Amino acid sequence: MARIAGVDIPRDKRVVISLTYVFGIGRTTAEKILTEAGISSETRVRDLTEDELGRIRDVIDRIKVEGDLRREVSLNIKRLMEIGSYRGLRHRRGLPVRGQNSKNNARTRKGPRRTVANKKK
């Protein structure tokens, strides 16, 4: 397994697919990385030379990925919560942030149901 940006990427897959195992790199970014490094997207990871791996690493070093990206996202969310914006309040309460309906659904964000017991009449 080749190691790129602290992630072991699978050897038997094509390079484009393997690069998506790194947090912050999707298909489009992977294509751009390979174009910039001058490597065919059809190549398998096991067929890459050390020189090609080095070129891929150099290109990825200029992009925010893995820990740096996770840290930036969490700091952005923390900032929203501190300034008291609507989005920050939704994050703090564990509710959907992007305007989704939360009357009946949103169970993923709200967690399991907490049932309230009825009073006897």
UniProtKB/Swiss-Prot annotation:
Origin organism lineage: Bacteria, Bacillati, Bacillota, Bacilli, Bacillales
GO (cellular component) term, any one: small ribosomal subunit
Family: Belongs to the universal ribosomal protein uS13 family.
Key words, A-Z: Ribonucleoprotein, Ribosomal protein, RNA-binding, rRNA-binding, tRNA-binding
Top-rank taxon, per record: Bacteria
Keyword RNA-binding found: yes
GO molecular function, one term: rRNA binding
One Pfam family here: Ribosomal_S13
Name of the coding gene: rpsM
Protein's name in the database: Small ribosomal subunit protein uS13
